[in-house]
Amino acid sequence: MYDAFENDLTVELNSGNVTAVNAAVAVMKGQQIANGGSYLDDDGSGNARITTHLHDAKTEAVLDLVEELSGQPCIIGYHFAHDLERLKAAFPNAPIIGSGVIGHKLDSIIDDWNAGKTPVLLAHPMSAGHGLNLQGTGHAVIWYSLTWSLEVYEQFIRRLWRQGQKNHIVVHHIMAKDTVDEAIMMAIRRKDKTQQTLLNAVRDYIKRDTIETVDY
């Protein structure tokens, strides 16, 4: 399924008609597949989006990593709703900072995290990217699903990397080899905050057989 997606993307790029916005949409489709799920086409009923489960490779990698952390608190960043469903199945007791989590509930989650009572915290970077103080305990950030936005990427990490943090922050990227995950990482490393950088990174990724391999 992923190979078919990438073949279609390559044809579109070679046509010269792909804009930065088109590239962002295409990358999101490829990223879903790499993560282990995908939204199905809209059935026209107006119901909530239907998803299909594809694999658990990333989820299993996260489980292994959390085990290696030996109880060190970690915050896991996710993107899509079906990412969260897989992570909830893997970590059923983990609290979630995401859409609709506000007020006293959010305050309670933050207090427990900073008190060291939460071994695994699931968070959407857009919900936990600004204003939250999470530096009281854990120093491990796990990106289950990368964002191409440098601002969102940096702000999410800075929730832990703030005054009062006593440890070095360690950032782990769960990446599917030979997928758009690598293009997204290229975009982040270029430290360019414009959407055009993603399109450029996707083009370089498609031509990866002729460019130097980058270690992450």
Residues of each region from the PLM?
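Short, well-ordered beta-strand core segments
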Residues: L121, A140-V141, L160
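Short amphipathic alpha-helical segments
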Residues: L87-A89, L132-G136, E154-Q155, M185-M186
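Short beta->alpha connector loops at strand-helix junctions that form conserved
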Residues: G98-G100, Y144-T147
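Conserved Helicase C-terminal RecA-like lobe
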Residues: M1-N133, L199-Y216
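A conserved SF2-helicase RecA2
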Residues: W148-Y216
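Flexible glycine-rich beta->alpha loop in the catalytic core of nucleotide-sugar glycosyltransferases
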Residues: A128, T147-W148
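A short beta-strand element within the Helicase C-terminal
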Residues: N133-L146, V170-H173
